[in-house]
């Protein structure tokens, strides 16, 4: 019992030390390094990542005028990332809260997402995007996972509300994504993993 108490005290002290270290992290420098690394990796994949600057915010950093171009083009006025220390320790994997303002995705025609965000948990076998939300012409609510080795959707349960002008595009996307239509302008991205197996 005495050994358990000592171990618990040590864990509390360690958690306090990490929290203090986290509070004084030079987030602007961390963000600048992370974005430079991301831009380099995107370039090797045939994509271009540009931004105008990085600022520190409480618990993370914010990137201004972000554009990611390739097969499609994603742009937003600002992208804010706040890594979660305690959540990462609990999940034994990196966890980060992501939010953006005035986001849009161009894929044939622009999709205006407005403001939104999600929480991402990145494990070696699965990247989870939960709490997906947007408030623009294209509204998304739900979650999905990506299998890094296959770069395919593993599990998903997300509602998508789209304007009438984009319905034809959704029908096309239906050939590549697990989309189900449930009324005018209302779609669901759904995929469940078979028990003990891999999602199809």
Question: What kind of region is each of these model predictions?
Answer:
Residues 7-24:
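Hydrophobic membrane-insertion alpha-helices, especially the h-region
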Residues 1-4:
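N-terminal Lys/Arg-rich, disordered targeting/topogenic segments
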Residues 94-160:
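Non-cytosolic head/periplasmic domains of membrane-anchored proteins
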Residues 22-77, 84-90:
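Terminal hydrophobic membrane-targeting helix
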Residues 51-56, 68, 76-91, 115-126, ...:
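Extended lipid/amphipathic-ligand handling interfaces
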Residues 159-162, 173:
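Predominantly the C-terminal beta-signal and adjacent terminal strand-loop region
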């Amino acid at each position: 019992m005495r050994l358990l108490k000592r171990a618990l005290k040590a864990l509390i002290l360690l958690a306090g030390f990490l929290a203090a270290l986290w509070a004084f992290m030079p987030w602007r420098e961390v963000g600048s390094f992370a974005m430079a690394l991301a831009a380099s990796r995107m370039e090797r994949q045939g994509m271009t990542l540009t931004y105008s600057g990085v600022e520190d915010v409480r618990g993370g950093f914010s990137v201004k005028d972000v554009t990611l171009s390739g097969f499609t083009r994603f742009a937003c006025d600002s992208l804010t990332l706040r890594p979660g220390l305690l959540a990462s320790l609990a999940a034994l994997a990196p966890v980060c809260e992501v939010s953006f303002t005035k986001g849009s995705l161009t894929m044939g025609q622009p999709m205006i997402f407005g403001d939104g965000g999600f929480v991402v948990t990145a494990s070696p076998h699965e990247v989870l995007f939960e709490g997906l939300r947007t408030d623009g012409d294209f509204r998304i609510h739900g979650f999905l996972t990506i299998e890094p080795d296959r770069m395919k959707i593993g599990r998903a349960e997300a509602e998508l509300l789209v304007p009438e002008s984009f319905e034809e595009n959704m029908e096309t996307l239906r050939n590549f994504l697990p989309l189900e239509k449930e009324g005018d302008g209302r779609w669901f991205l759904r995929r469940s993993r078979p028990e003990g197996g891999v999602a199809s």
